[in-house]
Amino acid sequence: MMAAEAGSEEGGPATAGTGGAAATGSSAYPAACRVKLPAAPPMAVAPCPGLADTDLAAALGGGAASGSGFLGTGPVSGVLGGAALTGGAAAGVAGAAAAGPAGDIALTKGTLSLPAETLGPGGGFPPLPPPPLLPPLGSGLGTVDEGDSLDGPEYEEEEVAIPLTAPPTNQWYHGKLDRTIAEERLRQAGKSGSYLIRESDRRPGSFVLSFLSQTNVVNHFRIIAMCGDYYIGGRRFSSLSDLIGYYSHVSCLLKGEKLLYPVAPPEPVEDRRRVRAILPYTKVPDTDEISFLKGDMFIVHNELEDGWMWVTNLRTDEQGLIVEDLVEEVGREEDPHEGKIWFHGKISKQEAYNLLMTVGQVCSFLVRPSDNTPGDYSLYFRTNENIQRFKICPTPNNQFMMGGRYYNSIGDIIDHYRKEQIVEGYYLKEPVPMQDQGQVLNDTVDGKEIYNTIRRKTKDAFYKNIVKKGYLLKKGKGKRWKNLYFILEGSDAQLIYFESEKRATKPKGLIDLSVCSVYVVHDSLFGRPNCFQIVVQHFSEEHYIFYFAGETPEQAEDWMKGLQAFCSLRKSSPGTSNKRLRQVSSLVLHIEEAHKLPVKHFTNPYCNIYLNSVQVAKTHAREGQNPVWSEEFVFDDLPPDINRFEITLSNKTKKSKDPDILFMRCQLSRLQKGHATDEWFLLSSHIPLKGIEPGSLRVRARYSMEKIMPEEEYSEFKELILQKELHVVYALSHVCGQDRTLLASILLKIFLHEKLESLLLCTLNDREISMEDEATTLFRATTLASTLMEQYMKATATQFVHHALKDSILKIMESKQSCELSPSKLEKNEDVNTNLAHLLSILSELVEKIFMASEILPPTLRYIYGCLQKSVQHKWPTNNTMRTRVVSGFVFLRLICPAILNPRMFNIISDSPSPIAARTLTLVAKSVQNLANLVEFGAKEPYMEGVNPFIKSNKHRMIMFLDELGNVPELPDTTEHSRTDLSRDLAALHEICVAHSDELRTLSNERGVQQHVLKKLLAITELLQQKQNQYTKTNDVR
């Protein structure tokens, strides 16, 4: 049994690892910090100072013992630590030893061994909250200059059963330390794998992990301390000790290298700032504030703006915000345990007895300073019969010894004996708190004025230099997207995100943009628009990636541009001044077809597209070994480090991720800039094909490096393009058949910037109508006019689409009721009449919403519809339906029905529809399109004839709706300014002119009226090319 205090407090060995016996095995540490270590040989145990002979005899279990501190006078058994070592009638535990010859103490009937290196949670700086939520195991991190920082993606918060163990804090924490001195200390240690953590001397409040690698290079990794958490390499930890434990036992810091040897400071460092509450406070609901009592002690983690601080309350272990007006500094001379709920630093021994007997219950406890040995502590514990005391001795290496066991903190001792018996049949339960919180405080504080001051403080200023803020969707681990609140902080180039704007204090995560690139994400990758990704790039091969989505294309573009300005790779790109040349690269890929894919591996092949090693897009799956995709992918404003594209082929299955089977790579340097390359690429295989040829893939690629001069250089070029006759536009339309989509996009942005989009669209539409002989084939072909109209509608009518469709589509997504009418697709015993009734109900609600949404369409778009109606009426005056059908062909065929069929592409939903919902959306789109065409279902789809009564009853309303859309006779004034990069758009159009200069030259010799304009265009194109070369030379000189 462990002897309690009698006349003197129980002693114990003072030095760990020399003369004291420490318990070994898993019971010596909390379960979450357990690690197996090799056992050292049995060691001699030195007698403890102040331990009476009778106490020693009882502690060793040598027979009957008596005294006021014991439970009885007969044989005694005690439990302290879980390892029973017996040496007589009594069973003694917790480092029990027996007196041997010459006064030495030898172990009896058991072996106590001391680990060569005692590991456990840190007991010094910083605080040790519960274990962190660990990310998946990963490869190493890259290194950065200390002025930079290193971070990565947020991982989903989930409990991972990985034990984290680290040496005590005093073995690796050096406090504020110069970089040069840190490197000297590591080199003096002389072992690769040596490490230390220090506070950055360049960025106070941040920490640096300094590590000596196998190449004898000292690498410095910045650790971002934020509201009690610690971020490094995309991973978040609750303490520096957990971070050390993770990179010691779980993951590599550099490729193949872990933390091995802590380098201790010359003497232990304790530099945490502590403050004490001078007044009580009750938190404001739904904030990150914490409530506290007068006298509570806090550890300060972050000093935020406007007097706010992020702290841990030592009494409750709660973290949150407090304001500095309610606290006072705690000096270094005060005991570091002040503020802990179990610590009583200013009461006597008798007062401790009285508290336990009056306020406490059986198994209650408290800790106070030792009366007999300054610097030591006594743990007071109440049993059924009496109060027992146990001595706690600090050791020179900043640990604490009790009963022959070594711990990293008194808190660890308490945690241990909450789980293990401290006396047979007893565990520590509830501590007795201090009874008079005000005894150490100045009672003359003017609380009223302080509280009034706090009410005037704002928490909006926690983060300095906020460049941009707002909500974005962020992709989680699976297919879920979550709406989070983001702050782009400019001073430290960090993107910080939170659960909501109301709780924008403690981050959910952060990304250090100085080691990042921003990549576009094609709509095909997630089946939704407006996505982009931030790639955290390390020296290791693995990338950490964050995916985001904006509500609109403009929002996504704004965020991308804002983020790119702080990415280190962007900062290094040449030409940031308005008076210098900018360079922007882009890539257009057409995945056309594959030939002779291996039959064994492909039934439903699809392609994944990568820029370098980052996936940015994918095609649809197609059937067979000779699939045809004919899909286009445009990647704009590429990061400057992109030097190749890769295409892999996978086979579509029901698995969450299909493995890549075949692949091809192409260096961008192979492609002629500004020209389309059409080539069959031989495929290589990731798996053995056993003599089978992997096949080939046809890809058309166009890589362009845009050299963008200041906007004023393009003034004459712009005037020529904007001439109301549109001769240049017609000529480019003639020569740019394969680049039609790109040409349309550039022209639309230029004309939108000049508020001349109606001139462009109406003129091209009129020309299309004038050239068409058959009313039934009008706008059926894909032309520059139809492409421009489609792009313009998607750019301006998003609000209309959401208002008209979102509610109905969300109901379809949630419903389990089928709308299937086709006999070949009906399930057994499925009632087709029930399905039809459900379909008609959906159609009625949806069409009603569409009819009521006409006023939401932009007035300029409605004016263009009106111009279309006038033009077709003039061309076909006897055709009464053309004015209706020409508008429905754009509004429904190219806008509403595509949004119904694929609502993710229009950002209406975030998850893929179920098979039932997908089929319902198809039937709804089919029915709505027939209604818009004013056509009933016939013999081709007889199972759909049940929808005909609905179509008949709504034909008149459809005609009225479409006529109303075009009822804007005058071009409306608009105050909206198109947010485009005009100089870039003009430069891109100039590149198209350069690429097609030969065709334009041929055309200028054929077209009489346009001849003068085209020759002028060619001359301006050549002049701009010369100016561009001059800018390039100037940039090279600089």
Swiss-Prot record:
Protein name, as recorded: Ras GTPase-activating protein 1
Positions of the C2 domain: 568-681
Native organism taxonomy: Eukaryota, Metazoa, Chordata, Craniata, Vertebrata
UniProt function note: Inhibitory regulator of the Ras-cyclic AMP pathway. Stimulates the GTPase of normal but not oncogenic Ras p21.
Places the protein is found: Cytoplasm
Post-translational modification Phosphoserine, affected residues: S822
Organism field: Rattus norvegicus (Rat)
Biased segments, Pro residues type: 124-135
Main location: cytoplasm
Keywords annotated in UniProt: Acetylation, Cytoplasm, GTPase activation, Phosphoprotein, Repeat, SH2 domain, SH3 domain
N-acetylmethionine: modified positions: M1
UniProt domain Ras-GAP: residue ranges: 755-965
Domain (SH3): residue spans on this chain: 270-332
Compositional bias segments (type: Low complexity): 1-16
Spans annotated as Disordered: 1-24, 117-152
